[in-house]
């Protein structure tokens, strides 16, 4: 039995969407919901307002206050415009960049955003078609704009779309601007939105920005000579119907690779993602067609970018010639190992160089940094925090690479969001480097494990939906704080970190301060054998995440499978000790 009071509230909100201010299709969709005997669609669409969070908007497309549509996008943009005008009131001409991916309605939403900004007297640089997220970030810096909006829902299912807000450094908004924008958006009513655009303030951009961006991406190349020797490296690439199709094959060609094969069916721009269940390069199902082509061509590497081309997944052959997926931690490890090793070999390292990883990403990276005497910085999850580290050291230090376990990587500082364009090009260079030495990417990974220690990472998502679920997650975190674990699957905990208190406690009870830009509801436990467990509630979904990392030693590459089997056993023991 549906809650009568809730239905009445939703009906009242829905009635407002029958006003002439709303377009005919929207009014018709709302009428159908109101007239239907089943009120599920009405409740889902109107029981709350789609929340503009610290990352912007993300939701299912459709009519209603809890859906992505031109009206919810419009109110978000009006609020963002109001905030920009507050912050830059002394500026003669505020400007923004507007970009979008391949999703259904992405162009419509991008044009809506452009119209509203221009109606507010803000100059808009609007891309002529879909472009990668990193190019949006680049363009904000290129045009010295004060902000930007990217219409994308990354690798979410086809029903979703989203709205990412950027600041003048090309990074996603951080404090205090995130809260400032949210505050302004929450004050906007639909009648406040200025939908009628000013065409004189909208400039269509495209090829010139592509050229400028790709010229800068070429500077990421570390060893052009190895590419010349291995230009015929067999590369298979798929954009999964998304924005990578515009730029990534071109970037690979400009770097000097002459044997690039794109998965034909997935080079078609299509927001329905007809060839995959979910357009997520992390999962094997999304790479089915890519693996088909890679096997047929006996390729050296398969790379896939997600719909907005900011993350890259890859596959290569193992020691038995079987195709395997390389996960996000391993990819980040290979990237940073290669950058450090080869910058050193070519005499390109400076004392000012540093790398960044998120706190939940593999600690093998810390081992490499320590052994190679290079500064490594830890930051919170979310690429805006890596961008924050770059901003902190601008003009004083030299950022040479950073990444996270969730398949995001950035090898340059002229972009301030994760970049699958430069990542794919650099991955191809790393593969060429391996082939030049008679090795594969898999062999390189084994070499890293042999020198710095084996590591296996596993993420556990515990879902707890609804209000009771949110309360349960809060209680779990409270319990972990009041009674922190001392043993994890047989491993003795020797260091406890609480990022809400910004405090670390060692085995003797000695407390030290953790230096971070702000507090965050995250806990970490480190064990004497190198085991690490990180716990944090998701900021966007009703779940709590456990990131487990376990260590082992490899004597030879043939030990890998045995190490992995032991790691899986260890991970299960840790899960059991945490009642997961």
Where is each model-derived feature located?
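Glycine-rich phosphate-binding loop plus the immediately following alpha-helix
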Residues: 166-194, 329-353, 357-366, 420
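Short Gly/Thr/Asp-enriched flexible loops that form oxyanion-binding sites at enzyme active sites
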Residues: 109-117, 160-167, 310-330, 365
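Gly/Ser/Thr-enriched, mixed-charge loops and adjacent short helices
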Residues: 17, 21, 25, 41-45, ...
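Conserved phosphate/anionic-ligand binding catalytic regions in large, soluble enzymes, centered on
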Residues: 46-66, 153-156, 235, 239-251, ...
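An N-terminal, well-structured beta->alpha segment
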Residues: 7-113, 203-232, 243
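N-terminal small/polar loop signature for handling phosphorylated ligands or for N-terminal nucleophile
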Residues: 97-160, 258-313
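Phosphate-binding and adjacent anionic-ligand microenvironments
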Residues: 295, 299-301, 322-324, 342-536, ...
């Amino acid at each position: 039995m549906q809650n009568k009071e809730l239905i009445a509230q939703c009906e009242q909100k829905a009635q407002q969407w029958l006003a002439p201010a709303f377009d005919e299709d929207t009014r018709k969709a709302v009428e159908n919901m109101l007239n239907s005997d089943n009120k599920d669609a009405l409740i889902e669409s109107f029981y709350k307002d789609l929340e503009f969070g610290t990352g912007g908007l993300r939701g299912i497309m459709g009519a209603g206050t809890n859906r992505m549509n031109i009206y919810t996008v419009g109110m978000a943009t009006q609020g963002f415009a109001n905030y920009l005008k507050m912050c830059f009131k002394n500026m003669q001409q505020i400007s923004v960049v507007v970009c979008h991916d391949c999703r259904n309605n992405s162009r419509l939403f991008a044009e809506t955003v452009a119209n509203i900004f221009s109606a507010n007297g803000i100059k808009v640089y609007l891309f002529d078609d879909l472009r990668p997220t990193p190019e949006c970030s680049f363009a904000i810096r290129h045009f010295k704009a004060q902000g930007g909006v990217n219409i994308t829902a990354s690798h979410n299912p086809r029903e979703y779309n989203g709205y990412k807000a950027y600041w003048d450094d090309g990074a996603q908004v951080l404090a205090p601007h995130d809260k400032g924008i949210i505050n302004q958006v929450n004050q906007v009513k639909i009648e406040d939105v200025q939908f009628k655009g000013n065409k004189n303030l909208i400039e269509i951009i495209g090829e010139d920005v592509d050229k400028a961006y790709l010229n800068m991406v070429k500077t990421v190349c570390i060893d052009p000579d190895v590419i010349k020797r291995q230009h015929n490296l067999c590369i298979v690439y798929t954009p999964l119907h998304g924005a990578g199709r515009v730029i990534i094959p071109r970037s690979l060609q400009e770097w000097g690779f002459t044997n690039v094969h794109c998965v034909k069916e997935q080079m078609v721009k299509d927001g329905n993602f007809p060839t995959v269940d979910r357009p997520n390069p992390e999962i094997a199902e999304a790479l089915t067609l890519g693996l088909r082509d890679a096997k047929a061509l006996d390729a050296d590497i398969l790379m896939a970018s997600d719909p907005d081309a900011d993350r890259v997944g890859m596959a290569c052959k193992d020691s038995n010639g079987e195709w395997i997926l390389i996960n996000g931690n391993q990819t980040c490890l290979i990237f940073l190992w290669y950058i450090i090793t080869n910058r050193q070999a070519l005499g390109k390292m400076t004392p000012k160089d540093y790398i960044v990883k998120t706190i939940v990403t593999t600690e093998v990276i810390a081992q490499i940094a320590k052994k190679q005497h290079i500064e490594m910085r830890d930051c919170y999850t979310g690429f805006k925090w890596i961008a924050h580290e770059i901003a902190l050291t601008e003009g004083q230090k030299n950022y040479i690479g950073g990444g996270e376990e969730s398949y995001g990587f950035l090898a340059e500082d002229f972009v301030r969001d994760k970049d699958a364009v430069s990542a794919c090009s650099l991955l191809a260079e790393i593969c060429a480097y391996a082939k030049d030495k008679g090795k594969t990417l898999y062999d390189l990974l084994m070499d890293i494990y042999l020198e710095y220690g084996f590591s296996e990472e596993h993420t556990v998502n515990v879902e707890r939906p609804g209000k009771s679920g949110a309360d349960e997650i809060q209680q779990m975190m409270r319990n972990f704080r009041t009674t922190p674990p001392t043993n994890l699957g047989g491993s003795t905990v020797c260091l406890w970190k609480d990022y809400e208190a910004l405090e670390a406690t060692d085995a003797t009870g000695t407390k030290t301060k953790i230096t971070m830009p702000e507090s965050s509801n995250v806990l970490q436990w480190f064990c004497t054998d190198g085991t690490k467990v990180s716990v944090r509630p998701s900021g966007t979904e009703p779940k709590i995440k456990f990131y487990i990392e376990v260590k082992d030693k490899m004597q030879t590459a043939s030990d890998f499978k045995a190490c992995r089997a032991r790691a899986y056993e260890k991970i299960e023991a840790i899960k059991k000790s945490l009642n997961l």
